[in-house]
Regions:
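Structured alpha/beta or helical-core interaction and ligand-binding surfaces enriched in interleaved
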Residues: 1-116, 121-149
Length: 149
């Protein structure tokens, strides 16, 4: 219950994202965002996307203590558990994975229908490493336009 309360608290904090786009696509952009999003999430391309997000989380686990919310809380999950959870979520087209960095008071959220990972309340230390990890996976790190505090 304590970790659930912590998640609720962190979801109200400043949010950053690691994603495939360098900035939020505006509703009036005139492009084909929804077609592209659907394609990336529902074609064979979703395997590449899954691999990138798994790699981000695994790399993060090298630098920080991590607990995940997957069928209960798992402290210091194995790399296989992380990959299995994300694969199952993407395969089912349903669900999310909460990744808590308890010593940093930071929350990373993976949702099956998003082209990004949301990172709530990252310290400067977490921001620095996440930006480098994002670049290493061909992704972008930016402050979210949502949840600004």
């Amino acid at each position: 219950m304590e970790q659930t309360n912590k998640i609720d608290e962190l979801l109200e904090k400043t949010c950053y994202v690691i994603g495939v786009f360098p900035e939020q696509v505006k509703p009036d952009a005139g492009g084909q965002y929804f077609d592209i999003e659907y394609y990336l999430l529902n074609s064979e391309k979703h395997f590449s996307l899954k691999d990138r997000f798994v790699n981000v989380i695994l790399k993060l686990m090298c630098y920080h203590h991590v607990s995940i919310q997957w069928k209960g809380w798992i402290d210091r999950p194995s790399p296989q558990t992380v990959e299995k959870a994300i694969s199952k979520i993407m395969g089912n087209h349903s669900g999310w994975l909460n990744i808590l960095l308890p010593e940093e008071d930071t929350l990373v959220v993976f949702e099956w229908d998003c082209l990004n990972l949301s990172v709530y309340n990252p310290s400067e230390n977490v921001q620095s490493i996440m930006q480098k990890i994002a670049v290493s996976e061909g992704l972008f790190w930016r402050k979210s336009e949502v949840n600004e505090t």
